[in-house]
Amino acid sequence: MLLPKRVKYRRVHRGKMRGNAKRGTTVHFGEFGLQALEASWITNRQIESARIAMTRYMKRGGKVWIKIFPHKPYTKKPLEVRMGSGKGAPEGWVAVVKPGKVMFEIAGVSEEVAREALRLASHKLPVKCKFVKREENGGDTNESN
């Protein structure tokens, strides 16, 4: 599971997810990527589940880069507790993902294998995604899934 080693504050504000991603919008390390089309919180468990789905389909061939990290703690109050009495205890960790962010990258496998592996990974995530390819001149070409 992905989670930070240390944090300055145990509880943080929820924040707003306005606009599109400004950084991490192109395929940088691998040949193929999975790009988010919606804004959402993605938990460390969802990231790990998507990673396992990809690597199992690829039969541990190729290389996978996870380009999102769950830095943000989220809290939850216990069941059947009245409102008030402070903020709840930390429950888990989430990565804030905005539209346009490339979340996973793959290299070392054919396009058909990469497309299917990323499709399986996208089913584990709470956002709509699309398959993107790396362009030779540095950018990426977008292809809808």
Swiss-Prot record:
<dbReference type="InterPro" id="IPR047873">
    <property type="entry name" value="Ribosomal_uL16"/>
</dbReference>
<keyword id="KW-0820">tRNA-binding</keyword>
<dbReference type="InterPro" id="IPR000114">
    <property type="entry name" value="Ribosomal_uL16_bact-type"/>
</dbReference>
<comment type="function">
    <text>Binds 23S rRNA and is also seen to make contacts with the A and possibly P site tRNAs.</text>
</comment>
<keyword id="KW-0687">Ribonucleoprotein</keyword>
<dbReference type="GO" id="GO:0006412">
    <property type="term" value="P:translation"/>
</dbReference>
<dbReference type="GO" id="GO:0000049">
    <property type="term" value="F:tRNA binding"/>
</dbReference>
<dbReference type="Pfam" id="PF00252">
    <property type="entry name" value="Ribosomal_L16"/>
</dbReference>
<comment type="subunit">
    <text>Part of the 50S ribosomal subunit.</text>
</comment>
<dbReference type="GO" id="GO:0003735">
    <property type="term" value="F:structural constituent of ribosome"/>
</dbReference>
<protein>
    <recommendedName>
        <fullName>Large ribosomal subunit protein uL16</fullName>
    </recommendedName>
</protein>
<dbReference type="InterPro" id="IPR016180">
    <property type="entry name" value="Ribosomal_uL16_dom"/>
</dbReference>
<comment type="similarity">
    <text>Belongs to the universal ribosomal protein uL16 family.</text>
</comment>
<keyword id="KW-0699">rRNA-binding</keyword>
<dbReference type="GO" id="GO:0019843">
    <property type="term" value="F:rRNA binding"/>
</dbReference>
<keyword id="KW-0689">Ribosomal protein</keyword>
<dbReference type="GO" id="GO:0022625">
    <property type="term" value="C:cytosolic large ribosomal subunit"/>
</dbReference>
<keyword id="KW-0694">RNA-binding</keyword>
<dbReference type="InterPro" id="IPR020798">
    <property type="entry name" value="Ribosomal_uL16_CS"/>
</dbReference>
<dbReference type="InterPro" id="IPR036920">
    <property type="entry name" value="Ribosomal_uL16_sf"/>
</dbReference>
